[in-house]
Regions:
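Conserved beta-strand-loop-alpha-helix junction that forms the acyl-donor binding cleft
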Residues: 103-118, 129-133
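Conserved beta-strand in the GNAT
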Residues: 51, 56-72
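Short amphipathic alpha-helix that is part of the acyltransferase structural core
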Residues: 1-34
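A short, internal acetyl-CoA/4′-phosphopantetheine-binding micro-motif in the GNAT/acyltransferase core
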Residues: 72-88
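A structural microfeature
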Residues: 61, 126-129
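Conserved acyl-CoA
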Residues: 88-102, 120
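Active-site rim helix/loop that mediates acceptor-substrate recognition in acyltransferases
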Residues: 28-47
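C-terminal "cap" of GNAT-fold acetyltransferases
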Residues: 130-146
């Protein structure tokens, strides 16, 4: 995988949930109708949950893959300080996954995540109204052919 990606810890989950980017916090609360801390707590029980430690030692992002290939991520502004390192580490992690299909939805307003997803090789399928506020989200997926 990467020297900067580690199994998720309680400390990393709470650090990231406490310092989310504006876009990620908005996507959690407005788009999914859930408190980011609840997502972080839930992620601790998953076997495939990770955190990205930036070169300056800060916990900069958490993410993971659920059993059905549903991929997710929450970031702090620290990832913007090391964008190339973060993107390359994410690519290594995604490319190492055994699932044939990785998928989820992303808030159309979250342009940072959309740009990263495009770099990682995900395809955007269609716009859908999603969540309690029926906001525009974009379905995306990546088919791993090996």
């Amino acid at each position: 995988m990467s020297n900067n990606i580690y199994p998720l810890t309680t400390e990393a989950a709470f650090t990231v949930a406490s310092h989310l980017t504006f876009e990620d916090k908005r996507e959690c609360t407005e788009g999914h109708g859930i408190d980011p801390f609840l997502l972080a707590i839930g992620a601790l029980s998953g076997d495939d949950s990770y955190f990205f430690k930036a070169p300056d030692g800060k916990s900069a992002a958490i993410g993971g893959v659920e059993n059905d290939g549903k991929i997710w991520m929450l970031c702090t502004d620290s990832v913007k300080e090391f964008p190339r390192t973060f993107a390359r580490d994410c690519k290594r992690m995604i490319d190492s996954r055994p699932e044939k299909l990785l998928w989820n939805v992303v808030d159309k307003r979250n342009t940072t995540h959309i740009k990263l997803l495009r770099f990682l090789g995900f395809k955007f399928l269609r716009e859908v109204l999603y969540g309690p506020k029926l906001l525009t989200f974009i379905e995306f997926c990546k088919i791993n052919v090996r």
